[in-house]
Swiss-Prot record:
Ca(2+) 4 binds at residues 553, 555. The keyword Transferase applies. Keywords: ATP-binding, Calcium, Kinase, Lipoprotein, Membrane, Metal-binding, Myristate, Nucleotide-binding, Phosphoprotein, Repeat, Serine/threonine-protein kinase, Stress response, Transferase. Residues 427-463, 464-499, 500-539, 542-571 form the EF-hand domain. This is CDPK-related kinase 1. Residues 390-420 are annotated as: Autoinhibitory domain. It comes from Arabidopsis thaliana (Mouse-ear cress). Autophosphorylated. Its EC number is 2.7.11.1.
């Protein structure tokens, strides 16, 4: 269901220039790479750019191996991923024996969705405009009602393809999400959903401007920085909106963004929520979905949240700016290993000629540690994009998560965070100022825990209710804590991990420690520090905490200060 808006049939042979690619054909001695046959790891998210097999004709340029920093040892993650996806969508049994379509796996499945069955009386189908693994998309015209005479897109999903309960649930959830989220200017407009005995029909806005992928190809494989900024702002805007509602897309790629019209100023529209899911701010997903070249490392590790979408946006940004993908290989196994282990190349052209801000933007999205990645709202405030848009920055759920942790922290850690917040620069404070303003501070400049709930209600949709974001926010609003001014809000909403990802982290940490020495540091016994950290009796505190305290005066050392900022857990300490 994830690619029913897939590339049109006539676009199969498209290719995109790739840095370092040659025209040398592979030798016949090379065996062809196996393809999984699943849309989530389709051989070609960007058709010929992302080749699935070296066994192609000599007329098609081959892709030489990129030189990685180190070899990748087995085992490969690909086999268990393919098996997992097969079980999810009913292609094979757990032992990978093929199941005939419509047989054992369909027994007892209820494929009735409760949608209207009057599709034929409302719309007349025209030609097919795209085809995916689980369905296809057609253009159609409204016969009556408010859409009479209007062209629309109809995503047709055959019920014969719904061979598992999970597949049926995915279709139901996609419709529910589109219905709840529709209205954002960069999200395809949803009109209605129908069904009959054979198919489900999802009626949406018809976008005639083509895929973002097509535009990349028309421009010779890449965008100028200014044009790339315009694309990124639109992608980040709709993704920030979805993430606030507790929706993670899970299949962001150039094919899933369409231009509304062929006009140069046409808005970009996000499509295909077939793989999307709800995610609560304090929960993680574990099912493996996505498209191989855009999948985040933590997805392969089966523990991820909205940060996985930000990785995919980083891959799109990389392609827009240089025309090459950051991670690639001839096989799926190689792609996964590259995503997990390899680093993107920022040394080859055109990267040295691009602005430092552009390079930093991409690097901060393609960080393998999801905790260090920018959120969509933060990315809109990045120096590379500031000044290129006038969007109102939306509320950011990471603020709510950080504030919750801050309130539950010890007084010692709060003092350390307060010192770190004082080292932030004016551009770094701009994002926090935006978030503070969205919370609606009083005339005296203070916010209470109730402000968090009130602010989120202003942006709520039915999707937010289904994702249980409300439950999380309500829990924060019920916490007993004093009102916060902007200075303490900065300390509470500061992500140490994200700051650590910056090149200026060392300066921030050293300067913060100097401030902490003056205002917050004090003599502390190891036992007291262990109690402050909530360490249990099983932790050998005199061993793991001895470097945290200076022997000269019994105060926190710089190492102890930095680790305290991170809120080191007892589990982390035991690994140290």
């Amino acid at each position: 269901m994830g690619i029913c808006h897939g590339k049109p049939v006539e676009q199969q042979s498209k290719s995109l220039p790739v840095s370092g690619e040659t025209n040398e054909a592979p030798t016949n001695s090379q065996p062809p790479a196996k393809s999984s046959g699943f849309p989530f790891y389709s051989p070609s998210p960007v058709p010929s750019l992302f080749k699935s097999s070296p066994s192609v004709s000599s007329s098609v340029s081959s892709t030489p191996l990129r030189i990685f920093k180190r070899p990748f040892p087995p085992p490969s993650p690909a086999k268990h991923i393919r098996a997992f996806l097969a079980r999810r969508y009913g292609s094979v049994k757990p032992n990978e024996v093929s199941i005939p379509e419509g047989k054992e796996c369909e027994i007892g499945l209820d494929k009735s969705f409760g949608f209207s069955k009057q599709f034929a009386s409302h719309y007349e189908i025209d030609g097919e405009v795209g085809r995916g693994h689980f369905g296809y998309t057609c253009s159609a015209k409204g016969k009556k009602g408010s859409l009479k005479g209007q062209e629309v897109a109809v995503k047709v999903i055959p019920k014969s393809k719904m061979t598992t309960a999970i597949a049926i649930e995915d279709v139901s959830r996609e419709v529910k999400m589109l219905r709840a989220l529709t209205g954002h200017k960069n999200l395809v407009q949803f009109y209605d959903a129908f069904e009959d005995d054979e198919n489900v029909y999802i009626v949406m806005e018809l976008c005639k401007g083509g895929e973002l992928l097509d535009k990349i190809l028309q421009r010779g494989g890449k965008y100028s920085e200014d044009d790339a900024k315009k694309v990124m702002v639109q992608i980040l805007s709709v993704v920030a909106y979805c993430h606030l509602q507790g929706v993670v897309h899970r299949d962001l790629k150039p094919e899933n963004f369409l231009f509304s019209t062929k006009d140069e100023t046409s808005p970009l529209k996000a499509i295909d929520f077939g793989l999307s899911d709800y995610v609560k701010p304090d929960e993680r997903l574990n099912d493996i979905v996505g498209s191989a070249y855009y999948v985040a490392p933590e997805v392969l590790h089966r523990t991820y949240g909205t940060e996985a979408d930000m990785w995919s946006i980083g891959v799109i940004a990389y392609i827009l700016l240089c025309g090459s993908r950051p991670f690639w290989a001839r096989t799926e196994s190689g792609i996964f290993r590259a995503v997990l282990k390899a680093e993107p190349n920022f040394e080859e052209a055109p990267w040295p000629s691009l602005s430092p801000e552009a390079v930093d933007f991409v690097k901060r999205l393609l960080n393998k540690d999801y905790r260090k990645r920018l959120t969509a709202a933060q990315a809109l405030c990045h120096p590379w994009l500031v000044g290129s848009h006038e969007l109102k920055i939306p509320s950011d759920m990471i603020i709510y998560k950080l504030v919750k942790v801050y309130i539950m922290s010890t007084s010692l850690r709060k003092s350390a965070l307060a010192a770190l917040a004082k080292t932030l620069t004016v551009p770094q404070l701009a994002y926090l100022r935006e978030q503070f303003t969205l919370l609606g501070p009083s005339k005296n400049g203070y916010i209470s825990m109730q402000n968090y709930k009130t602010a989120i209600l202003k942006s709520s949709t039915d999707a937010m209710k289904d994702s249980r974001v409300f439950d999380f926010v309500h829990m924060i609003s019920c916490l007993q804590y004093k009102k916060l001014d902007f200075e303490e809000f900065c300390a509470s909403a500061l992500s140490v991990y994200q700051l650590e990802a910056m090149e200026t982290w060392e300066q921030h940490a050293r300067r913060a420690y100097e401030l902490f020495e003056k205002d917050g540091n004090r003599p502390i016994m190891i036992e007291e520090l262990a109690s402050e950290l909530g360490l249990g009796p099983s932790v050998p505190v005199h061993v793991v905490l001895q470097d945290w305290i200076r022997h000269s005066d019994g105060k926190l050392s710089f190492l102890g200060f930095v680790r305290l900022l991170h809120g080191v857990s007892s589990r982390t300490l035991q690994k140290a």
